[in-house]
Amino acid sequence: MDPQSAVYSLPRVPTAAPPNAGVPWSHVGEVAVLSFVALICIYLLYLWVLRDLILVLKARRGRSTEELIFGSEAVDRRSPIPNTLEPTAPVHPGPFVPGSG
């Protein structure tokens, strides 16, 4: 066998595939998992800490926590609602007698 024919009789070995220019999928998966965990942590932080902190800060500004309404329907304490249901005659309750009823 001469050297010229030996080249053609050797098995062909495929060359390595060219490297991808994109990001490997394992890196994309890591970023997705870390983003999901961070989102859950922020949500739990809001549930356990930030929501109560917002209520405390609003209560310190002069409102009780029962009056807190978020948005445009907030209570205006400068003009209180007048009491229109004043009694026409004085009410004098009778003495309390136990067992009478």
UniProtKB/Swiss-Prot annotation:
GO cellular component, one term: host cell membrane
Ranges of biased composition (kind: Pro residues): 90-101
Keywords attached to this entry: Host membrane, Membrane, Transmembrane, Transmembrane helix, Transport, Viral movement protein
GO term, biological process aspect, one: transport of virus in host, cell to cell
Subcellular location: Host membrane
TM spans (from-to): 30-50
InterPro entries: Gemini_mov
Domain of life: Viruses
Function: Involved in the viral transport within, and between cells.
UniProt subunit comment: Interacts with the capsid protein (CP). Part of a MP-CP-viral DNA complex.
Protein name (database record): Movement protein
Organism, scientific name: Maize streak virus genotype E (isolate Pat)
